[in-house]
Structure formats: C-alpha cells, structure tokens
Amino acid sequence: MAAPVVGDADLQSVRRIRLDVLGMSCAACASRVETKLNKIPGVRASVNFATRVATIDAVGMAADELCGVVEKAGYHAAPHTETTVLDKRTKDPDGAHARRLLRRLLVAAVLFVPLADLSTLFAIVPSARVPGWGYILTALAAPVVTWAAWPFHSVALRNARHRTTSMETLISVGIVAATAWSLSSVFGDQPPREGSGIWRAILNSDSIYLEVAAGVTVFVLAGRYFEARAKSKAGSALRALAELGAKNVAVLLPDGAELVIPASELKKRQRFVTRPGETIAADGVVVDGSAAIDMSAMTGEAKPVRAYPAASVVGGTVVMDGRLVIEATAVGADTQFAAMVRLVEQAQTQKARAQRLADHIAGVFVPVVFVIAGLAGAAWLVSGAGADRAFSVTLGVLVIACPCALGLATPTAMMVASGRGAQLGIFIKGYRALETIRSIDTVVFDKTGTLTVGQLAVSTVTMAGSGTSERDREEVLGLAAAVESASEHAMAAAIVAASPDPGPVNGFVAVAGCGVSGEVGGHHVEVGKPSWITRTTPCHDAALVSARLDGESRGETVVFVSVDGVVRAALTIADTLKDSAAAAVAALRSRGLRTILLTGDNRAAADAVAAQVGIDSAVADMLPEGKVDVIQRLREEGHTVAMVGDGINDGPALVGADLGLAIGRGTDVALGAADIILVRDDLNTVPQALDLARATMRTIRMNMIWAFGYNVAAIPIAAAGLLNPLIAGAAMAFSSFFVVSNSLRLRNFGAQ
C-alpha cells in the first residue's frame, strides 16, 4: 500500500491533502462536507460529489484530523493514496454500487407491479376488497419500503443524528409519510368511498398511498442504478488507461538470468527485459535490442515507433517485435504514464465556477423544499381542500425535488471528457481550460519542436554543372557525410543521416565557424559555409548560386561541398516541418481563429515557415522572455490567447497565455505550465483538443440549464397539485438520469 499523497511532516506549511469521502448521496452532502472543512482556520477545501474526493489545502493540520472533521459531519473519510489511482484497473466502486442497487431494484419492481394494480383497484372499487386486503397490500409494500428503500433510510437517519438533511432525507420522509398515511387509511375506521377514474385513486378516493411509497422507491432506485452505471462507464476510460500498466516485469540479473517480479517492485536503474506483446513496465532507456513499439494506446498514434539502443521509451507502451533490454529511469508514480493518470484524475476532482454555485444552492436546497412542501400543504388546507388532497400535494413536492442533477451537471461531463481525451492523447488538466476555450480568438505557435520536428535534416541537394545523375548525388553526399561523421555539430548529424553508409575519414580538420575538411577515399573533401569553400576558388555555377540564394532567403542553412578543389554541390539544411502542421493551422483558421508564429529565427526563416503552413503572421528573433511580452501585448489588446509549445523553452509563454497547450511527450515544465497536454506529437490534436473542450462546455451548459430549469418548473407544478406523487418520483429520478446520459454522449467525441 502506497503512502498517502501528503505526509504528516512539516505541518506549518501549506499542504495539499486529498481524502476519499464515503457516504455522500447528493450535491447537498458534498456542500455540507465542504462547508465543515472550510470553517477550519487555515483550510481551503473543495469536495467533488461525482468523484467522492475532497481536495484540501491545509496549514497545521494532518490528514487524520481532517478525516475526523468529515466523520463529525456524518460521513466517512480516508486519505487518498496513489494506489487508488494506479489500481483503478481492478477498482470500480461505481460498478459495484450499481450491482448492489440492481438487486434491490429488481425485488422492488417485482413487488411494485401487483401492489400498484391492487391498490388502484381497491381504492377505486371498494366493493372489490376481499377479506384481508389490507394485509395483502402491506405484505407487498413492506419489503419495498423497508429493505429496498434502506439505502435512503440509513442515510436519512445518519443525517438526523448529525442534525443535517440531504436528498435521502426528502426521499425517506416521503416514503415513510406515504406508508404511514396509507396504513392509517387502510386499517383505520374511515368508511370506503367510491370513485371513478384512475386519478381518483390518488386525489379523491380512499387514501391508499402504498403504491406511491413503493413507486417512489422503485423510480429513485432505478435512477440511482442508471446513474451509478453511467458513472462507471464515465470512469472506464481512466481504468482502461490504468490497465495499460504492466503487472509483472522480467528483471535482468547480473549473471544474465531473468527474475519475474511485480512491476510495482521495480527499482530505478534496474534493467528489465521486454518481449513482443509485452507492456514496457517503466520509463527507461534502451540498452540492447531493437523493436517497434505500439504507442497507440497511450497517445492515439497509430504508426509504430522503432526503438534502438540509447532511445527513450515510455511505460505503458507495447513492444510489437524484437527483444529490448531497458534500464529504468522512472518507476511507479514517477513515470510519465502515472503522471498522465494523475492529470486525468485531478481534472475530474476540480470544480468549475458554475459547479460551485450549484453546490451552494444544493446545500440549502433540502431545507427550502421542506418549507415549500409545508407551505403548499397548509395553503391547500386553508383553501378548503381535504387532508388527503393537502397531503398528496405535500408528498408530490417532497419527491419531485432533486438537487442531485445540480451536483452531477458539471463533474459527470468532466469525467467523461477527460476519459475520452485520455484515449485520444489529450489531457485536460482542469476547468480553467474549459472556461477559457469559448473566448479564444488567437492561437500562438512556437516553431522548433512544435511546428517542426525539432531535428535538422538535409532538405535539398543541388549538383553543379553536369553532375546531375543520382549516382553523382549519392557519391557527393557520401563524401560529405564521411567528413562530417567526425564532427559533433548538429548540422553534421543531419548530413551524416542523409547518407546510408559514409566511409572512413583521415586527416580530419574542423575550422570553427567555417567548416570541416578531410581525406576520403583519396579525395580531399571540404564541407562548410559557401564563403569559406570559395575563399580560394570562386563559384560561378548558376545552379549552386541560385540554390544558395533561395535557401538563405527562406532562412535555411546552405553549405557547399568541395571535392579536390572543385565545388560539387550545395546542401540546404533545415528543421523539417511536421506533416500535420499545415492541416492543423488550416483547421484553426476555418474556425475563425487568428494564428501567429513566434520564433527565434531570423525574419526570412520566420516568414518562410509561416507561408508554408498558412499562418497569418510571424514574429521573428524572439527570446523566451520576448514570447511572454508578445502574448501579454496581445492580451492587453483584448485578445484571448492560446499558446502551443513543446515546453522546452516556452514554459513562461505557456503560463502567460490564457490557455497553454503543450505538445509532444511533455517535459516537467510543460506538465506544470500547460492547461492541456497533447501527448501525441501531432498538431491535428490542437484543433481536436479545442473542439473537445468546446463540446464539454456545451454539455455542461446543457446539464446546468436542465438541472436548474427542472427544479424551477417542477416544484411549483407539484405545489399547484398538478402532479400526483408517483409521477413526481419518476420525474425526479429521470432528472439525474438525463444529466448523466447527456454527459455520456461525449464518449463518442471524435469517433469516425
């Protein structure tokens, strides 16, 4: 068992403590726990009803003390541990809760059908009452209103002990009141009254409310069952992500033997073996072997990536072929995989401003409903209605009110969206991104590592004079690569990579800031700046001169290759644009967004890249702090700015923007600075991430409109006597079901 996220040391510093809170049944419960915690000096708490997690920033308090405060409020709490994140592949509390509810629901539904039929018959047609009819109805109703409804009664009793109320209080009081009134009517001395029409069984004939008590139980259980099942589905994406982690790992011993141990016991710098079909157990560096690695489950990237010795690999990915010996560089909770799982869970436990308002309303909702129900019943009595009619109205108000929908409106949408985003390689860190996204009008891109692959490559080879054959081209590239193979310059690596098999070099000489030279296969070869290569013999070849001018106008680097004193070729070296760059920029512009490029390159290079990918404007010669200044100036002009970068030298810009998107594998700076992490190194995920955020906000707004609108409309209708309690109970259950089901539509986001 892992230790709690926050220890007990250094109590005087502000520490973030996370607690699992059990026993909350509605948003009012979450609001009550949050209020209790926030009353403590030095404590700032946020309680999420959907995830049952309390996030607390506390000074001078240990986790045990905070758990005690929650216990006094009538709920159970325990420190949230890292294992509750990483072991989600085996833990599905909502699924288990749904199964428990289903058992009660099935029994209640089976008994409710004959109970409803007989209650209606006996109420409408008293002459149909057989001897012992009251005992028959009581026998059918008793298991439903006691055992099946016990989850509501138990919470209501616990609330009563702590002098609080919740949604369960409304339900339990409604069930108990309907049952007591019915038993009094059935076994009392009231003479039977004939009625006509099914509604008279509820409104004006004998007051047999047993089917109402049982019906409310059935409908609410059904609503809670579907709600729990839907929340289980909402968390399935996170469990699927956690499932990617390896369960066991084969550790390589010093004598070459292998020892299989649980992956949780793997230590940093230990070497382990991964074979085809196996999951890499930790982040690490390949020591031996070569293999294609399937990154799709982690990043959504369909194309396998080939790993060689010295290559970095990510835990949670799968080896497709070959055998790899890997040295672990990060294990357990320190891996990139674990960090991404934490990002998803943390996003699910945060609250939006709208949700805080909803929770505040839910906190006072239940007492207000009791007052409204009492006033409605009293008003009907004062107006001359009978006690039966007044009771029916009071009961209808009690059972139709539903703060649950308010509490579920935002977190269920966020749970589904963050889970779906994880499947697509998009990690939304919190509600800041969602609340900002709708006003974004400008997207700023870093160049190196964001629009480009971040690696220099030979983009063009221009031959001099008549040497235009493929054989001549390969020969010159081979000679240049042979000389450059002895150099450590970044451009040298690009030239070497362009030739499949460079030969050996002798007499290598490097001239700082100019170029290199050496003897290759009996030829004297020089590679370097055009001005250095032509220092003794000017080059007048039209093709080479044109290639030089064109390359330099685009901001690319041009080098000449001289063989035995004759300039043979011009090589253009540039950072290659990503294949997805132009399509991603076009997608953003089609959404009405302005695009800007920020780069440290010169003006020519910046304009060339902007033109190639279709960016509206470019700002050149930027230092990292200069990027922050540009973003700040845009914001002062009234623009809402999103910054897309790789987190390597643009961390401050990611923080300074209204919305930061870090693309690529994600450095520690990026994980801390960005609002959205795009794990897949594909720029098409930028518009996709913005679309997902917008879709999530639309869903949240729809949920909130429904939740508020339902209660605003339903309670007055019930108080006016226009709904019988049975239909009121069904409507209350449906309100929560609608919110959760609407959120589940986000599971299909991005599906083709």
Swiss-Prot record:
<dbReference type="InterPro" id="IPR008250">
    <property type="entry name" value="ATPase_P-typ_transduc_dom_A_sf"/>
</dbReference>
<keyword id="KW-1003">Cell membrane</keyword>
<keyword id="KW-0067">ATP-binding</keyword>
<dbReference type="Pfam" id="PF00702">
    <property type="entry name" value="Hydrolase"/>
</dbReference>
<dbReference type="InterPro" id="IPR017969">
    <property type="entry name" value="Heavy-metal-associated_CS"/>
</dbReference>
<feature type="active site" description="4-aspartylphosphate intermediate">
    <location>
        <position position="446"/>
    </location>
</feature>
<feature type="domain" description="HMA">
    <location>
        <begin position="15"/>
        <end position="78"/>
    </location>
</feature>
<dbReference type="InterPro" id="IPR018303">
    <property type="entry name" value="ATPase_P-typ_P_site"/>
</dbReference>
<dbReference type="GO" id="GO:0005829">
    <property type="term" value="C:cytosol"/>
</dbReference>
<feature type="transmembrane region" description="Helical">
    <location>
        <begin position="132"/>
        <end position="152"/>
    </location>
</feature>
<keyword id="KW-1133">Transmembrane helix</keyword>
<dbReference type="InterPro" id="IPR001757">
    <property type="entry name" value="P_typ_ATPase"/>
</dbReference>
<dbReference type="GO" id="GO:0005507">
    <property type="term" value="F:copper ion binding"/>
</dbReference>
<feature type="transmembrane region" description="Helical">
    <location>
        <begin position="105"/>
        <end position="125"/>
    </location>
</feature>
<dbReference type="InterPro" id="IPR023298">
    <property type="entry name" value="ATPase_P-typ_TM_dom_sf"/>
</dbReference>
<feature type="binding site">
    <location>
        <position position="26"/>
    </location>
    <ligand>
        <name>a metal cation</name>
    </ligand>
</feature>
<dbReference type="GO" id="GO:0055070">
    <property type="term" value="P:copper ion homeostasis"/>
</dbReference>
<dbReference type="GO" id="GO:0005886">
    <property type="term" value="C:plasma membrane"/>
</dbReference>
<comment type="similarity">
    <text>Belongs to the cation transport ATPase (P-type) (TC 3.A.3) family. Type IB subfamily.</text>
</comment>
<feature type="binding site">
    <location>
        <position position="29"/>
    </location>
    <ligand>
        <name>a metal cation</name>
    </ligand>
</feature>
<dbReference type="InterPro" id="IPR000579">
    <property type="entry name" value="Cation-trans_P-type_ATPase_A/B"/>
</dbReference>
<dbReference type="GO" id="GO:0005524">
    <property type="term" value="F:ATP binding"/>
</dbReference>
<feature type="transmembrane region" description="Helical">
    <location>
        <begin position="361"/>
        <end position="381"/>
    </location>
</feature>
<feature type="transmembrane region" description="Helical">
    <location>
        <begin position="714"/>
        <end position="734"/>
    </location>
</feature>
<dbReference type="InterPro" id="IPR036412">
    <property type="entry name" value="HAD-like_sf"/>
</dbReference>
<dbReference type="InterPro" id="IPR036163">
    <property type="entry name" value="HMA_dom_sf"/>
</dbReference>
<keyword id="KW-0812">Transmembrane</keyword>
<dbReference type="InterPro" id="IPR027256">
    <property type="entry name" value="P-typ_ATPase_IB"/>
</dbReference>
<feature type="transmembrane region" description="Helical">
    <location>
        <begin position="390"/>
        <end position="410"/>
    </location>
</feature>
<keyword id="KW-1278">Translocase</keyword>
<protein>
    <recommendedName>
        <fullName>Cation-transporting P-type ATPase B</fullName>
        <ecNumber>7.2.2.-</ecNumber>
    </recommendedName>
</protein>
<feature type="transmembrane region" description="Helical">
    <location>
        <begin position="491"/>
        <end position="511"/>
    </location>
</feature>
<dbReference type="GO" id="GO:0043682">
    <property type="term" value="F:P-type divalent copper transporter activity"/>
</dbReference>
<dbReference type="GO" id="GO:0016887">
    <property type="term" value="F:ATP hydrolysis activity"/>
</dbReference>
<keyword id="KW-0547">Nucleotide-binding</keyword>
<feature type="transmembrane region" description="Helical">
    <location>
        <begin position="167"/>
        <end position="187"/>
    </location>
</feature>
<dbReference type="Pfam" id="PF00122">
    <property type="entry name" value="E1-E2_ATPase"/>
</dbReference>
<keyword id="KW-0460">Magnesium</keyword>
<keyword id="KW-0479">Metal-binding</keyword>
<dbReference type="Pfam" id="PF00403">
    <property type="entry name" value="HMA"/>
</dbReference>
<dbReference type="InterPro" id="IPR044492">
    <property type="entry name" value="P_typ_ATPase_HD_dom"/>
</dbReference>
<dbReference type="InterPro" id="IPR006121">
    <property type="entry name" value="HMA_dom"/>
</dbReference>
